[in-house]
Each structure stands twice: as C-alpha cells, then as structure tokens.
C-alpha cells in the first residue's frame, strides 16, 4: 500500500525498517518522512505526531493455542470500547475473570500493551516482546497463556506456520485501540518554516492519495489479498 500511495502522490519512496518502539522518535528526528506500519490513530500518539485520515480498520484480538482452557471463552464477536454498551461491559467482565493469574504476551510500545496495563481487564501478568514474531514464538512454545495483538497478526502467523493458533473472545476496537490505522507524520505546527510547510503538504498529499486509493478499490484489494478480508475504511 505504501508504494501505491507514493505513486498516487507522484513520489518515489524508499521503505526502511525501524524497531517499533523507536518508530515515533525516529520520525521526529527526520530519519524518514512517514510511518506506514499498521499504526493505530490514538489520542496519545496525536499529542506528538500527526496522522492522515484512516485507511484501514484494524481490530485487536486474543489468541491461544488450540486445546487451551481459554479456547471456549464465550463473548460477543466484536466490541467497541469507544462507547461500550452492555454487551461490551459484560464481555470485559468475562475476559477479566478468564485472564486472572494468566500470563499475557504482547509487543512492547503498542496499544495492546497499554490496554493490558490500563486495568480494564484487571491485573494480569503482562510479558512484553520487542517484535510480534517473538510473541508468536513464545505463544507456540507455551511460555504465554494467551497473547494480544492485531487479529491479522495471529491469523497470518497461523496460516504461514501451520501452528494451531486460534482467536478467542471478542475482537476489540475503539477507545484505547484507536480509530483505525493511518499514515504517521511529523506535526508541521511544531516545526514552522520550510520544514513545517513540507510536512503539511505531505499530509495533504497522503490524504488525497488515500481518497483516490479507496475510490479505485486499491486498499480493499490489497487487504483481501494479504489478510483475507476487507479491512479498508
């Protein structure tokens, strides 16, 4: 998708790798110009960077190994934490009881870690990892009772590895999980001058490109191709 958006804005882009927990500081230090790494748009992140409009709706989910005692956890299919209704509140109570005393693994510096440490699901033993690959490996090795990440991270891993990883409980969205996924950019208002103007123009260009990519069905097609479902917004 990054290359597609770059074509829409008429730029030749280079994709570089960056550790997740250093992503925002590296952007602010101008090591690169934009973040396209499945970063959810949250109020906390908007304090330090700017986001384009959302282009994908990424939901979070809990995952266990097949045969786990948590596999049969019964809750609604999906809940929104932006305006939790009675079903959402009931689901959170069910999850809180199920996770009591369990070790929950997640990637460090993510909205998933923030949610687990917020107290919304009680006091759980949170174990963090630098990468999602490490989370997946320890889940399959039995060092995690359950893991929390973007649902697609688990379904993709299960498909490629053949490991019996299954999703349990509801999917989560809204609230601490943000309002979709967007392109992360530097805050032009904090820079001013030529650099600030450049970043402001880049934001406009990405928003326009996302509009066109959505209209052309590019985002939808890429989501279905790589994730198996339409995650476009």
Predicted regions and their residues:
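Acidic, polar ligand-binding/catalytic clefts
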Residues: 3, 7, 12-94, 165-180
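A ligand-binding cleft/hinge motif common to bilobed small-molecule-binding domains
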Residues: 22, 38-48, 114-119, 140-141, ...
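Bilobed "Venus flytrap"/periplasmic-binding protein-like clamshell domains
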Residues: 1-7, 61-131, 151-152, 217
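Solvent-exposed loop/turn segments at secondary-structure junctions
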Residues: 21-23, 40-44, 58, 68-70, ...
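Hydrophobic residues within well-ordered alpha-helices
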Residues: 5, 27-28, 138-140, 206
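Periplasmic-binding protein-like
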Residues: 57-64, 159-207, 209-233
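Short, well-ordered beta-strand segments
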Residues: 103-106, 147, 184, 194
């Amino acid at each position: 998708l990054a290359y597609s958006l770059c074509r829409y804005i008429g730029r030749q882009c280079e994709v570089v790798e960056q550790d997740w927990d250093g992503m925002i500081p590296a952007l602010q230090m101008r090591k690169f110009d934009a973040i396209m790494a499945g970063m959810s748009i949250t109020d906390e992140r908007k304090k330090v960077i700017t986001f384009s409009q959302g282009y994908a709706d990424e939901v979070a989910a809990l995952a266990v190994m097949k045969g786990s005692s948590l596999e049969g956890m019964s809750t609604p299919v999906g809940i929104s934490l932006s305006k939790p209704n009675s079903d959402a509140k009931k689901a959170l109570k069910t999850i809180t009881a199920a996770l009591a005393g369990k070790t929950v693994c997640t990637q460090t510096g993510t909205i998933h870690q923030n949610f687990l440490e917020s107290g919304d699901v009680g006091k759980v033993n949170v174990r963090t990892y630098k990468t999602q690959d490490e989370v997946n490996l320890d889940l399959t090795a039995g060092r995690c009772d359950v893991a929390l990440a973007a649902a697609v991270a688990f379904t993709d891993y299960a498909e490629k590895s053949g490991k019996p990883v299954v999703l349990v409980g509801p999917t989560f969205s809204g609230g601490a999980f943000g309002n979709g996924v967007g392109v992360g950019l530097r805050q032009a208002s904090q820079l001013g001058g030529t650099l600030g103007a450049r970043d402001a123009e880049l934001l406009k260009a990405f928003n326009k490109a996302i509009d066109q990519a959505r209209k052309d069905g590019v985002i939808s097609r890429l989501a279905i191709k790589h994730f198996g479902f339409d995650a476009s917004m």
